[in-house]
Amino acid sequence: MVCIPCIVIPLLLWVYKRFLEPFLYPIISPIINTFWTKKAVQETAASDQKVSEKSNGTCKPESNGEATANGSTIAADKKTD
């Protein structure tokens, strides 16, 4: 048997999202925006290229000056038993 709050709370949330929020949100949103403003994110212009490559998800593997012939460098990182 399912407890009463497990049925009532999702039902009340659905009623709020479906019927009450479209009327209440335009009234409440200007009030909330007055004290909860979003700050603009500023990117520094003097950032290092390596930092920017890592921050945007395109981190390139760093080379130590030696070329690998046909092997993969990932295999060296795996744990061997």
Swiss-Prot record:
Any one Pfam family match given in the protein's UniProt record, by short name: DUF4512
Ranges for region Disordered: 45-81
Polar residues compositional bias, start-end: 45-58
Matching PANTHER family: UPF0729 PROTEIN C18ORF32
Similarity-based family: Belongs to the UPF0729 family.
Listed name of the protein: UPF0729 protein C18orf32 homolog
Species this chain originates from: Anoplopoma fimbria (Sablefish)
